[in-house]
Amino acid sequence: FEFDNNGQMIPPTTRQGVFANVVRQPNLHDQILLEYGLRYVFFTDADSLDCTLTAPWFNNSPWQKTATMVPARYDIGKWFRAVNVEFMLDPGLKKFTIKEDEPLCYFGFGTEKPIEFIRFKMNDELKRYSVACSTSTSWDSWVPLANRYARFKETRMKQLVLKQIKENLVDG
């Protein structure tokens, strides 16, 4: 990814690569906040399970010399949304590269039990649920995440999400 002096993304010159987006103005001077164009969605039928996103600190990925990954954590048993992988570029940096097969991030799950990953199609209904959760801070600002979790449970959103997931499983 390459940017001009105004922080605007310069279109790639090749067809290889992954989409990215400058999602919002950075909070720090002369640093670009970049959202990587690959999102992950995790959800569980368990009551509660923390999912944590961190940088791949054991791998010494070259991109870590020029940017910092924004960590994230939420309860995938109480909330349904895509995980955005975001990078804060170092001050003044106008070019950011991640090489093929280079570790992007780590996902951790707060359990000692084995986890079974099951693929599902993200249909329009699931997209609406995910967008509602991920944008809730804009239409319901200053409400703590714990309160959002409670509302998610009270409105039986979990059952609606699980029903849609079960109807849209991808064969292995």
What are these regions, as identified by a protein language model?
Residues 1-172:
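DUTPase catalytic domain/fold
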